[in-house]
Design a protein with these regions (language model features):
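Short, intrinsically disordered, charge-balanced linker/junction segments flanking boundaries
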Residues: 1, 64, 168-179
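A conserved catalytic-core segment of Leloir-type glycosyltransferases
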Residues: 1-40
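An aromatic- and histidine-rich active-site surface loop
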Residues: 31-39, 53-93
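Acceptor-binding helix/loop patch of EC 2.4 sugar-transfer enzymes
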Residues: 14-26, 78-116, 160, 165
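Short, well-structured alpha-helical segments in soluble
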Residues: 37-49
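A polyampholytic, Gly/Pro-enriched intrinsically disordered region
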Residues: 27-34, 97-107, 171-178
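Donor nucleotide-sugar binding/catalytic pocket of nucleotide-sugar-dependent glycosyltransferases
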Residues: 8-11, 78, 108-173
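N-terminal subdomain of nucleotide-sugar transferases
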Residues: 1-7, 47-49, 68, 72-74, ...
């Protein structure tokens, strides 16, 4: 049990203009505007309150990482990050009539990956969690290296080594059916 004491909430809004522009698959733009507005407040809070760790929990969106790693004397944990996966072949029929959105999203993903590498934003993280292997490979693969530890975590909270492989699961199901 961890008693919650002295919790403070700070509300930071963004202008409605950005809310109207950044909708749907462009939502990460809204988060990036918000991150820029929050950074000065986060710096002040960390200095005044002696904060040790900032953990940015995004809506599983690698395109919307704040630059909290620039704040002095704190550890910046980011993730779980997702959004780097491509539309699976088995679901391409569902995208009929909306293919342009997937093409634009793919282009935006590549641009943000390039931007993250150039700015070094990922390397200012002290720890990164990835929500899926595709995003991990998309951001770390291709010769990119991270200067911080990272791991793959799933949205169900299980680590890959905690998952039962399919054949083991089938065996358990068969045993249960026999009883």
């Amino acid at each position: 049990s961890h008693p919650l004491e002295n919790i403070k909430f700070y509300y930071v809004d963004i202008p409605n203009f950005y809310k109207k522009i950044f909708k749907g698959f462009m939502y990460s733009g809204r988060l990036n505007v918000w991150n820029r507005r929050v950074l000065p407040l986060a710096k002040k809070i960390c200095a005044d309150q002696k904060i040790d760790v900032i953990h940015q929990i995004t809506p599983i969106e690698f395109r919307a990482i704040g630059d909290y790693g620039k704040i002095a004397n704190i550890k910046f944990v980011c993730g779980p990050l997702g959004g780097g996966e491509s539309l699976p072949n088995g679901l391409k029929d569902y995208a009929k009539g909306h293919e342009i959105i997937e093409v634009v999203r793919s282009g935006i993903n590549r641009w943000y990956r390039f931007k993250l590498r150039i700015t070094g934003k990922l390397n200012r993280c002290d720890y990164i969690m990835f929500a899926n292997k595709e995003t991990q490979e998309f951001l770390v693969g291709g010769g990119a290296e991270l200067n911080c530890p990272y791991e793959l975590v799933f949205d169900n909270g299980l680590r890959p080594d905690e998952l039962v492989n399919w054949t083991e699961k089938e065996k358990v199901n068969e045993e249960l059916q026999c009883k």
